[in-house]
């Protein structure tokens, strides 16, 4: 196999898995369809408070954030990536996974790779599920909200849910 572990997504879980891979001297590949790390947190509105629990990160140690603004959390993760040399293939989208014997063949937008293990750490926001209704591609239809202030005083319709919907 090309890799011991193939990691899809570079949010908190993907970063943690990559760090553990380095610590255990595993051959790994992380692919992220977006152009930056952070997963769903990257798409939170500006200054949104992210609630986190203390965690132990491989190579880093104990991390304690109770409430932290999105930007500070992303900055922390970027520092972790730089300090540890974590390698991430940005703008590479996973397209399929096929089991072949004792390994998996993962096809992405850039090629095919074989791996002993595949970890799907893409969270819930990777690619929005569209409703397949007329008008969903119109200019005023949005799938991500980065600055709620631009809609202040306006009527909006939110379709979907989750703790980051509003």
Where are these regions (language model features)?
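FAD-binding core/adjacent interface of flavoenzyme oxidoreductases
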Residues: 1-3, 23, 36, 43, ...
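Rossmann-like dinucleotide/flavin-binding elements
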Residues: 1-29, 37, 144-166
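Structured core of small recognition/catalytic domains
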Residues: 2-4, 18, 56, 64-65, ...
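Flexible, glycine-rich phosphate/dinucleotide-binding loops
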Residues: 14, 37, 50, 97, ...
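Glycine-rich active-site loop/strand segments that organize a redox cofactor
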Residues: 39-76
């Amino acid at each position: 196999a090309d890799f011991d572990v193939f990691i899809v997504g570079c949010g908190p879980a993907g970063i943690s898995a990559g760090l553990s891979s380095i610590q255990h001297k595993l051959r790994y590949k992380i692919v992220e369809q977006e152009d930056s790390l952070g997963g769903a947190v990257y798409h939170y509105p500006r200054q949104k408070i992210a609630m986190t629990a203390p965690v132990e990160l491989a190579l880093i140690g104990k991390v304690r954030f109770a409430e932290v603004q999105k930007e500070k959390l992303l900055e922390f993760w970027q520092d972790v990536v730089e300090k540890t040399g974590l390698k991430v293939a940005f703008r590479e989208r996973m397209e399929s996974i096929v089991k072949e014997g004792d390994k998996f063949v993962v096809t992405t937008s850039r090629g095919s790779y074989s791996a002993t293990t595949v970890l799907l750490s893409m969270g819930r926001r990777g690619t929005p599920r569209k409703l397949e209704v007329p008008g969903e591609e119109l200019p005023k239809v949005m799938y991500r909200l980065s600055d709620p202030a631009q809609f202040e005083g306006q009527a909006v319709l939110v379709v979907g849910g989750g703790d980051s919907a509003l």
